[in-house]
Amino acid sequence: MKKVHLGVIIAGAAVGLAALILTALGNPTNMGFCIACFLRDISGAVGLHSAAKVQYVRPEIIGLVLGAFIMSVASKEFKARAGSSPAIRFVLGAFVVIGALAFLGCPLRMVLRLGGGDLNALVGLIGFTGGILLGIASLKKGFSLKRSYEAHKAEGGVLPTVMAALLILVVTVPALFKFSEEGPGSMRAPFWIALVIALVVGALAQKSRLCMVGGLRDAFMLKDFHLLYSFVAIFVVTLVGNLAMGKFHLGFALQPIAHSAHLWNLLGMVLVGWGSVLLGGCPLRQLILAAQGNGDSAVTVFGMLVGAALAHNFGLAGNPDSKSEAGELIVGGISTAGKIAVVLGLVVMLVVVILNLPKKEEAKA
């Protein structure tokens, strides 16, 4: 087995194991890691939205960024670059998270949900794959957000600095932040344990180029499957772990923090897949790229934070399945505003692609 394959398998297995440990220690079920959900919690903690059930400074996000930053500096892979259509990336990042919160999970949580038996995530995977195929079609037509340029090191260090400052503030002045007393935001692993686990995962993700989108994109586009091994490793480890702990529950209805409104699970993840290909990586990959000096990815992460806040300020996020007092299933889903936002996001993706295709003169050249 090639060394690169072994590296991505180890990284994927570590992510799966870390997710199981974090869930066992208090994180929500099938949500050991979720980039979209955890960014949403942070946006609530700093006051960008007022949804009381989803507010917490998630140490997992801080750890992922700082772990990747430390690894990139240690391996001399930290390179400050920026200038590749930052405003467009901000908007795309916002819509990617809106799509993820319609589904109730980023691509990483989608895999974790599959490993827990949640078949709604299979619907999400179909949509995610469809979105990636749309992204590949866009790339083959010549779509590009143009090149980035070498930048000052201070530019590349923006997100690691923000995360380090956030860590210092939450430890020394926790009263500055809002913390959920019920709901998903109140379900959390011990802070320092979660931080240390995330530091390790961030370092491994940086070194292995771990990306939930990259595996499927490269498999379809280049017949290169090595990144896909990490995707499979995460699934296998979480599946085996959940089976061993009696946490595997196969089905659609009443899955943890999930809904069975299939159309919107599918379309939400189409939006995530398409947007992630256009951006050059999934939400996890954007965190890692920003940590190793990519200013454009940092802008994307800030867009994701704003998108998460918008999703809860305007009621765009999905609502989980529930039971009535009579014990009948109440299928969750998204509001009319959420449906409009997902469709609008798909339209925005299309417009961005069209406006960033090569002009006839460029194509001839």
Task: List PLM regions with ranges.
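Membrane-interfacial helix-loop segments of redox and metal-homeostasis proteins
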Residues: 1-365
